[in-house]
């Protein structure tokens, strides 16, 4: 419980930075031209122009100049050819939507069946509460997938408006971290029940489980606020499409803010929970090694949880940090392709979580016949 409180406190500290961005210029002409790095857009004619030859020691190499951001919010951006190439690529318009269609077809019925099974369960109230919240989070994610599917199939052209874009983005990221934290709460709950049974017996099971889930929803909502506050929908001039979250205004959402925000998100939302889960289930396996059937059941559950973390959550968070560090320190978005693929893998948890419920329910039933 103390660890969860520490996590909650850490999640509330969002870094505040000053809007600042750099533009990469490699042209040898007398004046710099507007060159926007992939997936970061900029308004037209908002950059200070001066002869590069005036820079002392300039030899024609790549130079970074400071952007002059407009005071008012804008909705139209200019991007480079690499960004447009990605937005029109088969990866973005065919492969990614195909994966999302598969997730929708499997995830919606799987989570509905899980909720139905949970509604019929009369014992192990903690298990019911945790998996109900997990299934609700996964189902919310799945029902927003048609918007993402239509977006990608339409050539990354968003037609559903700014509000829907922000909601979809919040649900997309929020589902992953909600699932991670709920799985962590489940691990803590099983650890207390097995390693400290007398302490666990004194706890009000229903209230304790609902409190933990409530904390998870509040923390995830607070950490998703930047996606709610910052503009996510931008119209691209040259390609005549409107993107949702794929292109951001470097002035409104500076690279320094994005870097520290996503690093803290990966640290508090993935790394710490992963360490807690490893500790809890390792202790459980050690405690139950003399009970063969229960021990084997926990081995299956732990392996499935490790699969979910290894395939779904680890690549997404690792590449997320590297991607934003790459842009923050080197002003390049070259890893965004890999990051989007990792996000697709991260979405698989919405289909794997229902299987985890059926495994865990058997283990709990063996512990409490």
From Swiss-Prot:
PROSITE patterns: G_PROTEIN_RECEP_F1_2
Intervals, Extracellular compartment: 38-93, 148-166, 230-259, 322-335
UniProt entry tagged with the keyword Membrane: yes
Molecular function GO labels: proteinase-activated receptor activity; receptor ligand activity; thrombin-activated receptor activity
UniProt-listed Pfam families: 7tm_1 (PF00001)
Glycosylated residues, chain numbering: 24, 81
PANTHER family membership: G-PROTEIN COUPLED RECEPTOR, PROTEINASE-ACTIVATED RECEPTOR 3
Protein name (record): Proteinase-activated receptor 3
Lineage: Eukaryota, Metazoa, Chordata, Craniata, Vertebrata
Gene that encodes it: F2rl2
